[in-house]
């Protein structure tokens, strides 16, 4: 089981190389080595034991300290082995830290022991030195400054090990990383300022970063000088930086403050540069893109460098360095080629001139030409130089004095790639850009300013549809003052003065309006409050400064667009539509369609509650014909996946669809028509220029467009959390309030360049914020609607119930409760107005969800913490909760139970869904908490019941599933029931024998496992509160002992058993192996294996021992007319013993009334339904009521005698036909044969064989049929050809005006016919595929008709593997069989046509007659013969394959590698790639023999043939 690592501990970066070296040390004499996990375990264990040393970095000093402390510890008896492993692992790490390379763990421990001995000698020597020099202090501090006992200090150089340690961290994590800062802060506490700065300079790192660090140190020095004027006790910058001091002077105690200040400056500089490297706009992150010109790259780079708060020399260095290192490969090569060795010192202007043409087509062609130009002599170099800019020879383009010349328009000042004339030419292609939709009025480059008279003064106000209020900076005091007013915008909350009834005039229009006086406003604005009154409108789509990317859309291949006529509309609706369309045309959203655009889509309108009309478009046909686009956004963002942020802003994009232009070539398919009332004039046709509402691709095009527009802006602001779904935008950040609002303002300005606006009235600043149906708070989130409506007992329509359930499902991520009873209520009638009835159980279920929604609150995701998902069994569902801290869920959910899945499988399915949700919303893999025990889940996985487990999982106790655990594997006081079930003598049987003497057995269909469970079920039904059950089925035994939940059992037998078990006090379940001599088990096995008289159904009653027969019950009220016979099927199936037969007789009470039972012999072994034939001999109708005893079943012993020859002298008075009391039963079948013949008109032989009537009687039926006499077949049919299994003949025939394609199988005579449209090759090939799919033929005979000999037909026959031969058309010898079939088919068809409405039905009936009803001499139909042949082929193939698999061999066995004698021959039971399995006759064991010890021989029967 894997375990997920936590992010709280970032590992041991300082020991990365040490651990890598330690992993090469072998544990023992074998090849096994220490692993990284062993090392990490040892280090973390030590951190846990010695918490006071946990924060210190792992130096060799710390390791010796830990080693000394470990030696002083005494582990418990149970932990000694683990403690020894800890010491051994630490010894290996210490050796690797010191650069030693021991081969084994034992060698590492020896090295450390030897080092300890040397250290003890050194300490002893140190004691002698102390005696000689008592003033010398024994130091234990970090070098280089050493305190002496006499009070002085000495300096010692930085240890090389420490220096190497810092170098390693700087190389692996970076010079400005947190790891290097932490290491430096630890070691440098006792360093001199000079040591700190020298070590910093010698560290590996980016030169630009070092320059920035130096710049930050200079800034700190300047700030120190400003804040600390020179004085007697004030440190100077030179003292702090260690300038002009020796290390010995700097080590004195009075310089401690200077060293601390210097270290603080260095750490501050490291942090500042690190912050610069991670924020957007960092010059070192500004790199040239592949498609970006060098000039654009330099512009971005210089802008980023100028924004840096560093000194000018640093900026100059960054410009010179980064303009080369951050350039693209092509530009670097061009600069190397042009500037040579001075490329690093060259100015930015020189580099721009060198790279001016890099990336252009001319540059690429120039490189290609240079590559293909042959090498010339050195003396001619430069003679034919020509300027690419002006075209004159003698100099290059970079040396041209005429400046940049455009090669497209010829003007100076810009390059060809920036030429505006070139960009304006050409038609839009996919991926091209186009401007936002423009009105037919004036187009402005920015929001316009217009002159408005405010009071008595004329002012130029900015027209802004995003502003609610009209704002001016000053006012002449006219109007009515209304006090102070608070305004909220992107810049925050501001306060101004409100004035009403102010005189406003625009051109000739004058109104009384409201204004706000705000002296601090940078611009005066005309807001929406007065724009409408003055008749001023602004089309927001006209304000773009950049072009909106276009998305290509098109129709499906072969489609021509919708051509649906406009349906009539009322005068009222036409007027409403005209008003809407006129406004759309003025705003540039629709245009007049040209006459050759013929597509049309219907439009209509509805009136809203406000009384305004709303235009609707029926785009269904256009949507069908339009190619789909990929789904841009696969789901709704969830607040549980958001991170907690200090500030949030919710924005709404106004007129989102109507701002984005529709792909121009597609616009012709969006035309619609405005009708003219009473046809008084021509109709006006329009088309859409923008994304219309209701068109299926509008959402996708909008999402792709916004993705392209916002991609760059989002990349430039990685510090914010940005989300967008359709026109709703979420922005969250941990920045300061002003900086956060500045970013929002920047976004508004950015998308305004494309024509999009963010209306002020829909902007939400701060918490609580409503977004996509959620309500966001600083520490939590919930749904906007916190409550669900109440439901009460009583009727409710399905429509209303579906809406209620839909509201609940939407809020499941905070409820997490299942509603199985309410969901079950929705089953049944699907009509929306059909009623359901709400009961108390539904109300309780609903109230539980309402209460949960009120109480639950969601939390935000913290990327620093692990995510957990806990699953548990709910009410017929799996409920799970996703959290990072207990009691603070991110979200919850429910997975309803799935049929035919076990409990474990359903929990794993829910775990998969949970994992998928977490990965989608947070990008992390969760830790799954499964209910139950780990060993149970591992067992489920090993048994194959589940095939997936989470990456990280563990178990918890889970909810209690059994209220009462009453099934145990121990003996309980009470009777014992021995149960058994299975297939006995080909019939399912089950039963039990109790220790009380009670017995029970019954026949029943089912599998062995089902019958075993049914036996236990019957025992549980009859058993007392305490009982024992003994079974020989391991399956049933394990089921009874499993910790099942009744709700998850899908097997109905198991569910019934569990229901019975719940009501028992205690049940002991025991298992015994079958057929092992256990008396009671063998007794029940014999008992249910006996063939016993068994019945199924309620149509028979038990009899007394003295009664002759069993009474049969009439199933329903039966009416028998006078003199009529009626067959009555009763509810009874019976299973007779092999030595029994039965007879159905008349009851004496019925015989007295003239009602008799006729016939009714039941043979031995009969298992079918019983039918009673009743004859009413009376002159009036007789009624037998339901439930009346009307016949009796008499059992008789079966007596069997062999028949002997009578003798030639014997004579019979019965006649040649043998008609007698038993032979006359066929008379009853004559009416049935006549009825069948009237349906299908089969011949006499078929009737004779099917109904068992004499041949003469069958011939009489045919002769008396008028239809058959009128349509007699010719008596003689000649002609024949090849016959064989799977060999067919085919030909066309005509019946009246219809063409029929006829196929006939030559062996069986099976016919297949189909009506076709014509005798074409295409039609024949289609029918051939149908014919082949049904019959799988091998060969086919046809004439030379054009449809049969076409090349495509021949290719099809080869493809299908059919051997196709052709003969001569109309030659009886080549097509005899199919020609005869034509006549038979048409003759039968003519008989059946009057009986059917459709010709195809009559043709199908003809095939039934000829293939199924027509019997041959042996009583078989063509269909019987065909099926028999196919089965024989299958059996032969199977037998052949089995024979091929049987092999025989001689073999020998080996003992200690020496081969023994050859044994055999014997049969090979199994053969593999390198060995076989045989059975040794002597030991009766199975042996695996390698192929080298085997000699294969032919089967024994082949040897006999020889």
From Swiss-Prot:
Entry's cofactor comment: The RT polymerase active site binds 2 magnesium ions.
Sample GO molecular function, one term: aspartic-type endopeptidase activity
InterPro entries referenced in this protein's UniProt entry, alphabetically: Aspartic_peptidase_AS, DNA/RNA_pol_sf, dUTPase-like, dUTPase-like_sf, dUTPase_trimeric, Gag_p24_C, Integrase-like_N, Integrase_C_dom_sf_retrovir
UniProt: Mg(2+) 3 binding residues: 1291, 1343, 1379
Zinc finger (CCHC-type): 385-402, 404-421
Every Reverse transcriptase domain range: 587-776
Pfam families on file: dUTPase, Gag_p24, Gag_p24_C, Integrase_Zn, RNase_H, rve, RVP, RVT_1
DNA-binding region per Swiss-Prot/TrEMBL record: 1447-1499
Entry cofactors: Mg(2+)
ZnF Integrase-type span: 1228-1269
Gene Ontology BP, a term: DNA recombination
Residues noted as binding Zn(2+) in the record, renumbered to the chain: 1237, 1241, 1265, 1268
Chain sites annotated for binding Mg(2+) 1: 652, 727-728
Domain Integrase catalytic positions: 1270-1430
Additional facts recorded: The reverse transcriptase is an error-prone enzyme that lacks a proof-reading function. High mutations rate is a direct consequence of this characteristic. RT also displays frequent template switching leading to high recombination rate. Recombination mostly occurs between homologous regions of the two copackaged RNA genomes. If these two RNA molecules derive from different viral strains, reverse transcription will give rise to highly recombinated proviral DNAs.
Family: Belongs to the retroviral Pol polyprotein family.
Name assigned to this protein: Gag-Pol polyprotein
Species of origin: Maedi visna virus (strain 1514 / clone LV1-1KS2) (MVV)
Gene name linked to the record: pol
